[in-house]
Amino acid sequence: MKKIAVLTSGGDSPGMNAAVRAVVRTAIYNEIEVYGVYHGYQGLLNDDIHKLELGSVGDTIQRGGTFLYSARCPEFKEQEVRKVAIENLRKRGIEGLVVIGGDGSYRGAQRISEECKEIQTIGIPGTIDNDINGTDFTIGFDTALNTIIGLVDKIRDTASSHARTFIIEAMGRDCGDLALWAGLSVGAETIVVPEVKTDIKEIADKIEQGIKRGKKHSIVLVAEGCMTAQDCQKELSQYINVDNRVSVLGHVQRGGSPTGADRVLASRLGGYAVDLLMQGETAKGVGIKNNKIVATSFDEIFDGKDHKFDYSLYELANKLSI
């Protein structure tokens, strides 16, 4: 292994820079040249590929986002388009590609490894949604979780001041982990997630029971993959008449300096990705399972169901929110 490349793809997440840094420095430590692909798979097509040095990743571990930039590239699903990308790697003698991103990013990496045996590919899970099989946690999840906690804590201050119910929408796509973990952490009265059937009347009854016991305000935390906060508000109004407001947290959840947990995870996964390439491994995603760094084939990741919603945590949150 003489030359490798690294790119970030899909939605950005805090800790991506730390992962790139780990890839670059582990490779250079092992006398491997490293190239950065700017703007994700689009950069592969546009030949936006540049050599990275030790200094290229200096002062990046604490930065959110990705200095390599990211972009959606739906045309990468077409084989003729991928041929251009593969040729741009081959002409530089690049033998390994590390892809940091989510499920779609992994699928692009798998296609490259299938269509060009000369290029090994390894995926690193970078997304705030925590929705990738083969790992307990994705890079960016912990930072986004802490961002949500900070925001909801502030919203609770104003909710209590005005005796209001706030319906707050968190990101997560089709995975309820962010809403679940944040909801437990902030003491939300109700958590609405895609993994659990939503009964709006039950939510209304719970809020009403709280009011009867003297509660002055409530927090309803909604995962975007289940319903919008506005829809939740509209349906709730059919069963209960309380002063309420909607707050959609939005893209602020993707930003910010990564937490220590995300920096450590990104560093461990980035270093291990290079180790795997040096061992001749390909078409695998790295992850953390039971605090151990592991590698799982892309096929297993796409077919697997090992990243399960924690129903016991959901039940605990329900018990504690009475």
UniProtKB/Swiss-Prot annotation:
Active-site feature positions: D129
Listed pathway(s): Carbohydrate degradation; glycolysis; D-glyceraldehyde 3-phosphate and glycerone phosphate from D-glucose: step 3/4
SUPFAM superfamilies: Phosphofructokinase
Main location, first listed in the record: cytoplasm
One Pfam family, short name: PFK
InterPro entries xrefs: ATP_PFK (IPR022953), ATP_PFK_prok-type (IPR012003), PFKA_ATP_prok (IPR012828), Phosphofructokinase_CS (IPR015912), Phosphofructokinase_dom (IPR000023), PKF_sf (IPR035966)
GO molecular function: 6-phosphofructokinase activity; ATP binding; fructose-6-phosphate binding; metal ion binding
Organism this protein belongs to: Staphylococcus aureus (strain NCTC 8325 / PS 47)
Keywords, alphabetical: Allosteric enzyme, ATP-binding, Cytoplasm, Glycolysis, Kinase, Magnesium, Metal-binding, Nucleotide-binding, Transferase
Residues that coordinate or bind substrate: T127, I128, D129, R164, M171, G172, R173, E224, R245, H251, V252, Q253, R254
Highest taxon of source: Bacteria
EC nos: 2.7.1.11
Consequence of changing R164A: Complete loss of fructose 6-phosphate binding
Keyword flag Metal-binding: yes
Self-association and partners: Homotetramer. Homodimer, inactive form. Component of a possible RNA degradosome complex composed of cshA, eno, pfkA, pnp, rnjA, rnjB, rnpA and rny. Interacts specifically with RNA helicase CshA.
Activity regulation (record text): Exists as both a dimer and a tetramer and the equilibrium between the active tetramer and inactive dimer is regulated by several allosteric effectors, including protein concentration, pH, ADP, ATP, AMP-PNP, and F6P. ADP, ATP, low pH, and AMP-PNP shift the equilibrium toward the dimer.
GO (cellular component) term, any one: 6-phosphofructokinase complex
Cell location: Cytoplasm
Protein name: ATP-dependent 6-phosphofructokinase
Binding positions for Mg(2+) per the UniProt entry: D103
